[in-house]
């Protein structure tokens, strides 16, 4: 797309966010980015947790507890307004640095904003080593519609 139209500008912003190393940003940049990402989230459509079918309704099973509280989602995870989402992050926990890449790590970091990469970098610096496979960290969701936090 032409970078002068909305779609082109959005792709360019995403690509620049993807290659940006974690670092503090000018507050005015962050404010503008947050406005744009919130508008983009609204345009995609936010899915509230109450709209999600539970596994109890889809797969009746008496051996699984809390089937009326567990949902499976197939779609754009960045649209969900839920308590937490889980990202298949890499061991550096900094997100995907490939511009416009279609992986879930890139999608989450692109929808959350540069603050997520910054927070992940701070967590990893304090930890002092890469994240072992199968472990997770809890971060804020920033511009994701996820309610209180996002799990990585």
Predicted regions and their residues:
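Macrodomain-like recognition of ADP-ribose-binding/processing modules
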Residues: 1-152
């Amino acid at each position: 797309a032409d970078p002068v139209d909305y779609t082109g500008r959005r792709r360019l912003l995403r690509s620049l966010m993807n290659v940006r190393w974690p670092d503090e940003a000018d507050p005015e940049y962050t404010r503008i980015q947050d406005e744009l990402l919130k508008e983009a989230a609204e345009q995609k459509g936010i899915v509230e947790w109450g709209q999600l079918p539970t596994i109890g309704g889809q797969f009746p099973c008496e051996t699984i507890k809390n089937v009326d509280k567990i949902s499976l989602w197939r779609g754009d995870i960045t649209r969900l307004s839920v308590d937490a989402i889980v990202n298949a992050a890499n061991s550096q926990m900094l997100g995907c640095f490939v511009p416009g890449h279609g992986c879930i790590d890139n999608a989450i970091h692109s929808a959350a904003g540069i603050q997520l990469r910054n927070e992940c970098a701070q967590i990893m610096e304090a930890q002092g080593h890469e994240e072992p496979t199968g472990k997770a960290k809890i971060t804020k969701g920033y511009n994701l519609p996820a309610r209180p936090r996002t799990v990585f």
